[in-house]
């Protein structure tokens, strides 16, 4: 058997066999076999962004489409930890628009190149959509007062969330 090193282009192989008896060597060459290399680049995506809770992110775009020798297909995937990705049902175009979000989520695009029934699969880099979660808190102190009278102080429960919180 023979194990070839990694290939980057189509390569043909054949074997030379020799048999020697005494001073006589006979040599024969086998038929050739071809290893077809599917040249493939999964491309890249862009669209990392920060949105407000329940907001809809801008569509993720294809910075570079996948390139390959075969038929190229796409499948978008999502992950809450940036490591374990799952397919997004129906998300099979080179661009993707996600609905409203409440949780930070990583997205990546799987590209598949199919040639002669063989598939090569690779992934774009992952992009993160950061969700700025915030609870507005509350105020109370509804009252009725006379004209030119100062109302009693309002009471409040502070807002909580990601980032710096300010009030107006």
Enumerate the predicted regions with their spans.
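Solvent-exposed loop segments of extracellular immunoglobulin-like
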Residues: 65-75, 160-168
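Proline-enriched interdomain boundary motifs that mark the N-terminal boundary
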Residues: 38-48, 133-142
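A short beta-strand segment in extracellular, disulfide-stabilized domains
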Residues: 55-65, 149-159
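Surface-exposed, flexible coil segments in extracellular/virion-facing regions
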Residues: 1-6, 77-99
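Exposed beta-strand face motif in extracellular beta-rich ectodomains
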Residues: 9-13, 103-107
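Conserved Ser/Thr-centered positions that define the repeating blades of beta-propeller domains
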Residues: 1, 14, 76-79, 108, ...
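Terminal edge beta-strands and adjacent linker/stalk segments
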Residues: 25-38, 119-132
């Amino acid at each position: 058997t023979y194990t070839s090193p990694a290939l980057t282009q189509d390569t043909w192989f054949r074997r030379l066999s020799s048999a020697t008896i005494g001073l006589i060597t006979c040599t024969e060459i086998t038929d050739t076999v071809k290893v077809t290399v599917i040249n493939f680049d999964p491309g890249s995506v862009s669209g990392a962004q920060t949105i407000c809770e329940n907001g809809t992110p801008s569509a993720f775009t294809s910075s570079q489409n996948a390139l390959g020798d075969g038929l190229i297909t796409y499948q978008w995937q999502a992950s809450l930890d940036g490591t374990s990705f799952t397919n997004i049902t129906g998300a099979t175009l080179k661009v993707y628009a996600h609905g409203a979000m409440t949780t930070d989520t990583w997205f990546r695009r799987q590209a598949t190149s199919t040639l002669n029934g063989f598939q090569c699969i690779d992934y774009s880099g992952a992009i993160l959509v950061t969700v700025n979660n915030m609870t507005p808190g509350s105020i109370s102190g509804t009252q009725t007062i006379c004209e030119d009278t100062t109302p009693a102080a309002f009471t409040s429960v502070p807002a909580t969330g990601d980032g710096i919180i300010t009030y107006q």
